[in-house]
Amino acid sequence: MSLQKLENSSNKSVVQEEVLILTELLEDITKNMLAPETFEKIIQLKELSTQEDYQGLNRLVTSLSNDEMVYISRYFSILPLLINISEDVDLAYEINHQNNIDQDYLGKLSTTIKLVAEKENAVEILEHLNVVPVLTAHPTQVQRKSMLDLTNHIHSLLRKYRDVKLGLINKDKWYNDLRRYIEIIMQTDMIREKKLKVTNEITNAMEYYNSSFLKAVPHLTTEYKRLAQAHGLNLKQAKPITMGMWIGGDRDGNPFVTAKTLKQSALTQCEVIMNYYDKKIYQLYREFSLSTSIVNVSKQVREMARQSKDNSIYREKELYRRALFDIQSKIQATKTYLIEDEEVGTRYETANDFYKDLIAIRDSLLENKGESLISGDFVELLQAVEIFGFYLASIDMRQDSSVYEACVAELLKSAGIHSRYSELSEEEKCDLLLKELEEDPRILSATHAEKSELLAKELAIFKTARVLKDKLGDDVIRQTIISHATSLSDMLELAILLKEVGLVDTERARVQIVPLFETIEDLDHSEETMRKYLSLSLAKKWIDSRNNYQEIMLGYSDSNKDGGYLSSCWTLYKAQQQLTAIGDEFGVKVTFFHGRGGTVGRGGGPTYEAITSQPLKSIKDRIRLTEQGEVIGNKYGNKDAAYYNLEMLVSAAINRMITQKKSDTNTPNRYEAIMDQVVDRSYDIYRDLVFGNEHFYDYFFESSPIKAISSFNIGSRPAARKTITEIGGLRAIPWVFSWSQSRVMFPGWYGVGSSFKEFINKNPENIAILRDMYQNWPFFQSLLSNVDMVLSKSNMNIAFEYAKLCEDEQVKAIYETILNEWQVTKNVILAIEGHDELLADNPYLKASLDYRMPYFNILNYIQLELIKRQRRGELSSDQERLIHITINGIATGLRNSG
């Protein structure tokens, strides 16, 4: 049975009603704030945009004064935000509704568990599956926390709208509350005055744990085990979802991430989870008023009660309460020790000790007629302890390979081993490094030579990691990632630094060494690099000590910027095939960490389809993927959305593991040969323009708001690793962000159309082959669907206005090249899909874009005019911030940024 997406079953009329109410309130509030003639211009702008009268729209925007721009920009930035909230509420309602009526939908957990239960190895699959969303703080989260808090209030009110319609809630009060929060939003700064610090990013991430993850993850795990049990599958230690974190440990290109921020990130996480445990234990304490006059308790609970300092005469017979008081006291003492290094009483040594005490309570209840008390909060607390321990989320450390090389070169020189390490050949480097790792037990940094700031900083981070692992548990830091990994020596250099602080030795590795292959070239050579690594007896011991898993991270953003969307997707697909095969050859479980962004140009797109279209056998039982700054709020802003999106991750991974489609086994040889041919041409088309056209650099920087984005206070990390003098030096995130703002969406489609058109023109029958690929190959279907979505969000009329910002005619002429490829791509996509219009298979998104597009199209024209005035020197520094407001509004309307 073919299941539809949950979004496409939603009640669009309710969303439209809510949007109408929100729009009327926003208009009324804005009307009271503005002069009548200014407010009238807002109405005129909406009419012109709805009619697609872009010339009239441009004329009216040009006539606006700088002061008028302030409120008009705010109005059109807030409107798409309110629409987003309404859609999110509708999705949350639909999730609950479909579950309550037991209706299947694509990715539903119960449907997936039922499917896997039929397999002989069902218990093995479900027991070992582990999907890890890794939260990052890439500089694309444009919303301030204050704005997020306000939108959460509106979200809560809109959830009550159906009750208002039924007369179950006072309509006037509901309406006035809604108005009040919209009015506060209208008068609140939408963007940050100052750039975020890493500490701010850590705090912001923790808000999502408090609002959603701490509710959704244990609940999903409980449901996962319950559904399996219903099919006779007894799962013991299953953890389908655990959490990862980059904030505080990802120092690639971010000089503000240090040993101090790593420690702060870990201890902040610890504080959040310990507070959660404290609160949950207290709730149980309040509930469990069971008396031994009525029911008995186990011997172990009696002993816990005896040790308790809760000596109230009123609780002499309430042994569960006394035992829980003892548990809570230990949790509080443990928190004080872990965070403040202070011993204040009996504490837990490990999270497992805490878990054992809770199990003692559970077993006593089971033995003494208290089965019903174990459901709900109690069982979810047990799941939380298993999942989160005392550390909450595993923090990754990441640094660029060039930094590791510089540090190792300095160590070798100061220790008198080699003075010119960086000048050695790859083979010579590896021989030298292996000798140090295998034969020399000494610590190179023990020398009295003064260390450079770079080396001292890196060693301090690794030393802090070791201390945190000893204190909070080994899982607090599991991986250390090498950005721009190109060779075996890159991996061994990191091992040298880890050896310095005792995180690796000749027998084991306390953290996994994870290469990140990012560019097209590095992905092409990744098989060779990993073959050399897996051939090492030393590496085999390290991998064995990590339960025979070897993780490899794949970079979607840089490979896209390097070779275009089609080339990136296909190179990543083939790399996974090759790396999976080499893992099987060496008897190692190769798992993948997908470095996806929020946009298609950075590997984004619908999560379920992305996972289920991965190569055959590439998902063993673990998969990790980044959840980037700008989409965390959309996907995990509340517990319902979080549950749904986590459910999609788990179901997709299971379905890909168990589904052996005919297309997987019979089609690759023919289809892959076609893809190789088409991709080679697409790569050349993309590279010829981006890196081969001497005017392209100027076109990009003059026809986009990249300069404003670079100064936008949306993250702690700089927009580039170094001074930008070429496209290659620009980070992938502002690269994609800028193209989104100018509505070209270039990274998500350029080079796709012409390469397929040339293939079709070679033989009239080739279009039928491509249609067959689209119908029967999940990878190809996902690829084209993403291009379809990106094209639907682009607007080449608006893109032309941005092109006019270029002064040189030769530079400006690049627009025609881009436009021609856009039209070719659209025609080819529709021809292969067999559709007459874009988004034919996604009516929910189409409807959403149809009623939001007119509003944020206006923001593009306002942004264009502001950029022109800025370049003419007509804006004050305060007025220049208006450009940032438009950036915020457009990103909100598109529902992604970088």
Swiss-Prot record:
It comes from the Bacteria. It holds the Pfam family PEPcase. One of its GO terms (molecular function) is phosphoenolpyruvate carboxylase activity. Its EC number is 4.1.1.31. Its cofactor is Mg(2+). InterPro entries: PEP_COase, PEP_COase_bac/pln-type, PEP_COase_Lys_AS, PEPCASE_His_AS, Pyrv/PenolPyrv_kinase-like_dom. GO terms for biological process: carbon fixation; oxaloacetate metabolic process; tricarboxylic acid cycle. Keywords: Carbon dioxide fixation, Lyase, Magnesium. It catalyses: oxaloacetate + phosphate = phosphoenolpyruvate + hydrogencarbonate. One of its GO terms (cellular component) is cytosol. PROSITE patterns: PEPCASE_1, PEPCASE_2. NCBIfam families: PRK00009.1. Forms oxaloacetate, a four-carbon dicarboxylic acid source for the tricarboxylic acid cycle. Belongs to the PEPCase type 1 family. HAMAP family: PEPcase_type1. This is Phosphoenolpyruvate carboxylase. It comes from Streptococcus pneumoniae serotype 2 (strain D39 / NCTC 7466). The gene is ppc.
